Swiss-Prot record:
This is Putative 2-hydroxyacid dehydrogenase SAR2389. It is an enzyme of class 1 (oxidoreductase). Its EC number is 1.1.1.-. NAD(+) binds at residues 155-156, 234-236, 260, 283-286. It comes from the Bacteria. Belongs to the D-isomer specific 2-hydroxyacid dehydrogenase family. The keyword Membrane does not apply. Keywords: NAD, Oxidoreductase.
Length: 317
């Protein structure tokens, strides 16, 4: 029986599928799998199930001389050297559609949390308490009637747009390509990035990461935004220059931010932790039972297809 190496614990539903077709070796240590352990694990493996936090570089790929597939448990895949994997004739797959609803839900949740100061209010209620209702106390912003600007109208961005429309928000979007059919379906308007930044009350990043997207939102972009704007990032941390974000918040160039991902993840810039107008969550975009189970099944089926000589779903290289 061929071996699959699983770089961390995954939901039981996918693990059971793998056990029906493979000898399964899974990393069960504390924290993330280290490079030496990963290299040892893939040496005699036909398939690797990597996590979004698993760094699959050239050394790891070279060690996996029998690898046919690297099935990444996550929608992103910038943790894998996909070009080198292609050179070695190794398929790399991801789990794109499983994350759509969960990440869109979280994105809108972050919009509401930062605009209505929900987390800040929770902390106040648990610590010092409050004196009671008052007309000027703890005011935030409504989302109804506001404009949301979505960077990246893919599956997740489109799901965010549909939810935003349910809140009676106007929807702007930007990206490398205009999507006229989705515009008609959702009621969204395509604009360039600068126009979006200047006009949106809430800016959500829902685009995939690539090197061209690095620091897409930097000092210059923050200066374009409304002073009452909010930035929400549930995509990839390096799209936003975190130090520039800190300065924009401290200088009141924007009103607030909500982040589920970080430039130096898992580390979080200390200044962000000290600001009351920032909501921080620990990369939980697709952390629902439903999404994680679906992702588990997708990576398992991809690995099974590859060793059976079939083309797996969601190949990215």
């Amino acid at each position: 029986m061929e071996k699959v190496y699983v770089a961390g614990a995954i939901p039981e539903v996918g693990l059971k599928l793998l056990q029906e077709h493979f000898e399964v070796e899974m990393y069960e240590g504390k924290g993330l799998v280290d490079k030496d352990t990963l290299i040892k694990g893939v040496k005699d493996a036909t398939a690797l199930i990597s996590l979004l936090s698993t760094n699959v570089d050239k050394d790891v790929i070279d060690a996996g001389k029998d690898l046919k597939i690297i099935a990444n448990y996550g929608a992103g895949f910038n943790n894998i050297d996909i070009e080198y994997a292609r050179e070695k004739s190794i398929d790399v797959t991801n789990t794109p559609k499983a994350s759509t609803n969960a990440t869109a839900d979280l994105t809108i949740g972050l919009v509401l949390a930062v605009a209505r100061r929900i987390v800040e209010g929770d902390q106040l209620s648990r610590t010092t308490g409050f004196d009671g209702w008052a007309p000027l106390f703890f005011r935030g912003r409504e989302v109804s009637g506001k404009t949301i600007g979505i960077i990246g109208l893919g599956e997740i961005g489109s799901a965010v747009a549909r939810r935003a429309r349910a809140f009676d928000m106007d929807v702007l979007y930007t990206g490398p390509n205009r999507k006229e059919e989705k515009e008609r379906e959702i009621g969204a308007k395509y604009v360039d990035l600068d126009t979006l930044l200047k006009n949106a009350d809430f800016i959500t990043i829902n685009a995939a990461y690539n090197p061209k997207m690095h620091h897409l939102i930097d000092t210059e972009q923050f200066k374009m935004m409304k002073s009452t704007a909010y930035l929400i990032n549930a995509s990839r941390g390096p799209i936003v220059h975190e130090q520039a974000l800190v300065q924009a918040l401290k200088n009141n160039e924007i009103e607030g931010a909500a982040l589920d991902v970080y430039e130096f993840e898992p580390d979080i810039t200390d200044d962000l932790k000290s600001l009351n107008n920032v909501v921080l969550t620990p990369h939980i975009g697709n952390a629902t039972f439903e999404a994680r189970d679906m992702m588990s099944k997708i990576v398992a089926n991809a690995a099974i297809s590859a060793v059976q000589g079939e083309k797996p779903q969601f190949v990215v290289n």
